[in-house]
């Protein structure tokens, strides 16, 4: 029993240390963000932010749409800062800023949510949110609810947004039909960022929404 308690304490210390390192990274990223944002404002570009549950494919989508080569990993908090690229809108003949944000998780500790809020400043000030989901995940509906709840807690639930179903190359027609039935009032966008499916249609929707 004593050994078990020791292991539990060791695990708690490990998690505490990991949380401390994450907070420190977030503080570092936050310092220069205000100056960078002012520079973007001077250029007069609108901002579109990609939000979603962790591992939904947000960074892959940013890379494909902007030509950036950001780190992609199947792990929590792989994207701690907010990465930003430019997306060219051909029909509008102008660019918008496209920002990738951290992946949300269920029951995010309040102290970490406060720290992450600073990195989500791009999303808070965005003209449009792209809520990316993993259509192949069995917990899809729960993940959508988690993201919506966090957006509400950040006060940005009324920002215009679209719901994008990613990884459609991994789902059956029956699963697609079930998803459509689950979101009867949503004009869903269907893509596979990794396979370059539906990206042109997504850009057209962004053009429509951004005005």
Where are these regions (language model features)?
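Canonical P-loop GTPase G-domain recognition
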Residues: 159-162, 169-211
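Inter-motif core of Ras-like GTPase G domains
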Residues: 112-137, 153
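Short coil/turn segments at beta-strand junctions that form active-site/ligand-binding loops
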Residues: 93-94, 127, 159, 186
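Amphipathic helical hotspot of TIR/SEFIR-family domains
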Residues: 140-154
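Conserved G1/Walker A P-loop phosphate-binding module
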Residues: 1-113, 120-124
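Conserved ATPase-coupling elements of RecA-like P-loop NTPase cores
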Residues: 107-110, 139-144, 172-177
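Structural beta-sheet core signal
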Residues: 131, 163-165
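Conserved nucleotide-binding/hydrolysis micro-motifs of P-loop NTPases
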Residues: 102-105, 135-139, 167-172, 194-198
